[in-house]
Regions:
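Non-catalytic pre-domain segments flanking phosphatase-related domains
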Residues: 1-21, 66
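Mg2+-dependent phosphoryl-transfer enzymes with acidic/Ser/Thr/Gly-rich catalytic loops
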Residues: 8, 12, 32-34, 201-294
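Hydrophobic "anchor" residues
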Residues: 24-27
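Active-site phosphate-binding/coordination module
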Residues: 31-141
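Residue-level detector of anion-binding/catalytic polar loops
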Residues: 48, 195, 250-251
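Short hydrophobic/aromatic-enriched beta-strand-loop microsegments
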Residues: 70-76, 158-159, 251-256
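Short, surface-exposed amphipathic charged segments that create phosphate/polyanion-binding patches used
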Residues: 87-92, 153-156, 288-293
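Conserved acidic, metal-coordinating active-site core of Asp-based
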Residues: 130-233, 239
Length: 294
């Protein structure tokens, strides 16, 4: 992997990009072409690009290496912020209370992690307790054999193993439950402060995950490093936009359909722009749009 960008190399920039990449570089199949060149251009221009994913830290390592991404990323759908070693020389601060407090951090692999959700195995135990209390059977991925894991995720065995090695959330599926049982399970879980997110045929459960808090913590670090506020710009496809756009100051929707067909990605009071997802010059168009200063 290329060396991480460090704080002294942060240059004057009006914006920090937050890009939801799971539909741009999907776990299976071909991704959108040109992302690596786009990443290189952003680096050359000194524009940080934070990637957001529902994948795990280990699962996300290969896509980051392949596309030359050396900036922070938000993984497990808002469970934590991961900072490459040496990226900032600033200690994260919490906004709680009148005076800024040192935010707790973890060392996970090559990264300094700002945890937002409660770390495993707390969510795993809460899931097991809920399943037992309601007599609704669930199967966590960690309980599967390597062959069963690959079959249920649709991933090659090595990638499937990385997918279930999580830091904060637990992946699982329901085992023969009716729709009514599933709804009852989810409702009771939410009452217990569990956060459920669908991921295809799978579900994830976490405690305290929040994309908004991830962006807030990271934006505070960038503002301190730059000594001014850089605008939060969100970039996403329609299916991922609702989880990102409400927390951004400016948004860019990547879609081949008319933006009016995606009302769920509209956010009141936020300037939204649109670029055709599968246009030949997608990333050049994105750069053109980003060059338009508010």
């Amino acid at each position: 992997m290329a060396p991480a960008t460090s704080e002294p190399r942060l240059r004057q920039t009006s914006s920090i990009l937050y890009i939801a990449v799971d539909s741009i570089i999907p776990p299976r199949g071909k991704g959108v072409r040109g992302l690596d060149q786009f990443t290189a251009i952003l680096d050359h221009q000194g524009i940080p690009a934070v990637w957001l994913t529902n994948r795990s830290r280990l699962q996300f390592d290969e896509p980051r290496r392949k596309h030359g991404h050396t900036h922070p990323f938000i993984a497990e759908e808002g469970c934590a912020v991961y900072l490459p070693e040496g990226y900032f020389h600033l200690r994260p601060e919490s906004a709680a209370g009148r005076k800024p407090q040192k935010a707790p951090t973890l060392r996970l692999g090559r990264f300094v992690c700002i945890p937002i959700a409660v770390a495993l195995p707390v969510a795993s135990q809460a899931l097991a307790d809920l399943s037992e209390d309601l007599a609704v059977p669930v199967v966590p991925l960690r309980a599967l054999s390597p062959r069963e894991l690959s079959q249920n995720t649709g991933l090659p065995q090595r990638e499937a193993e990385l997918a279930r090695q999580r830091d904060f959330d637990e992946l699982f599926f329901f085992a023969g439950s009716s729709n009514d049982e599933i709804e009852r399970f989810l409702a009771e879980g939410r009452r217990r402060k569990l956060l459920f997110r669908p991921q295809g045929v799978l579900w994830s459960v976490a405690i305290g995950a929040s994309v908004q808090r991830c962006i807030r913590e990271l934006s505070r670090l960038y503002d301190r490093a730059l000594r001014y506020h850089a605008h939060v710009v969100g970039i996403a496809t329609p299916e991922l936009a609702p989880g990102l756009f409400p927390f951004c100051e400016r948004t860019l929707l990547l879609s081949d359909r008319d933006p009016a067909e995606h009302p769920h990605s509209e956010v009141s009071g936020i300037r939204r722009q649109h670029v055709l997802l599968h246009s030949e010059d997608l990333w050049a168009r994105v750069l053109d749009v980003l060059a338009l200063k508010s």
